[in-house]
Amino acid sequence: GAQWNPTVIENSEGPAIVNEQALNKLDLNDGVINIKTAGQEVKVDNLSGTGGTINAAAQKKEDGKLTSAKLQVGQVDSTAGTPHLAVNYQGINADDLDADTAAAMTQLASNIQAQGATQTQTVAEGDVAGAVVAQVNEDGDVSAVTESANSVMGSLHQIAQNNFLVFRSQMNDMDKRMGDLRTMPHASGMWARAIAGQSEYKSMHNTYQTLQIGADHRIGNFLIGATASYTDGDGSLKNGSSDDKNYNFGLYGSWLGDDGQFVDVTLKRHHTQSDYDLYYTRGEKVDGSMHTSGTSLSVEYGRRFNIANTNYYLEPQAELMYGHLDSADYTTGNGVRISQDAIKSLVGRLGIAAGWVSPEKTGSAYIKASVLNDWEAESDIRASKDGIS
């Protein structure tokens, strides 16, 4: 549609006077009206058509009050249907609104008088607060106000949650090594393995590679060892990307009973770090990094039942894992202060494995099914800047 730019003409020889611009009739069909000066008044005697977009200049005064350009429509012609106006306030954002966003939007909405048309009025997201949208009915009353999550704050939360999920998955990623040692008792010593995979959390997609090394030593029915691993991941979000890293090292031990019973214990220290490049809905880029550390402990009990006269076995298992990922405080590239709560995870697992061991005990294959429950794993982040939170 066409665009109309009502222009303020100032008398350079005297004080500036913002006069009212007026039209007798406006047929608006997906057109745009740009009112570029806060306090500017535009009057339309008769409005018809399907509606369009109103970009209205607005500002927050020194006394904290909001003001915006004004549009006054005398009569709305709804013969062909009710016109709808999409009003965008420009020059302010959601950080400029008071805590009572409904009252602030009602104050702004009073500047756009178009009884007989419906309106959707929007204040764009700020550095901290999400976009605020008010629905205005045909009587000119605000019928609903909704606040959306800030796009960057939401993505930071997703990155933090993804780091936690990686942390939780590595609280006990020693099960394969422990299983190998139960299957091949003389295989203790130096070892290494590499893993590649993908994960999804809400709208975040992560591709990662893990390198894990370790060494262990058997003493009778006991086995002790140490391990270290490094995970490098690339996160893709709707409004940006992240480079995610996880480092951990740990000690592990196992008791292997002569009757097939076993107890595995793993203690680890973890460190996570993410560098991110994100974009607000207005197109502004923000970058930065977050990092934190954590500790985990897992204890697993099970028993391997060899099926007589075969190379197959069944292995019921029960495991309890506890992890604590420390709180984190950091500042984004545009000065938003983030406080991330510590996350506690208490995971219980019941499972059963069915497997096959080669007669020479040089190889094996198995399948495993488990039921898990996490009694903790709640997290939250708080954002603040210049008194806005």
What are these regions (language model features)?
Residues 238, 275-279, 326-334, 377-383:
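Outer-membrane beta-barrel and related beta-rich outer-membrane complex signature
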Residues 98-113, 206-222, 337-345:
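Short secondary-structure subsegments characteristic of cysteine-rich extracellular domains
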Residues 88-199:
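Interface/linker segment at the passenger-translocator junction
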Residues 1-110:
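Extracellular beta-strand/loop-rich repeat segments of large surface/secreted proteins
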Residues 67-69, 209-211, 224, 247-249, ...:
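One face of beta-strands
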Residues 314, 319-325:
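Solvent-exposed flexible segments
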Residues 250, 254, 339-389:
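Outer membrane beta-barrel transmembrane domains
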Residues 148-308:
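Outer membrane beta-barrel translocator domains of Type V secretion systems
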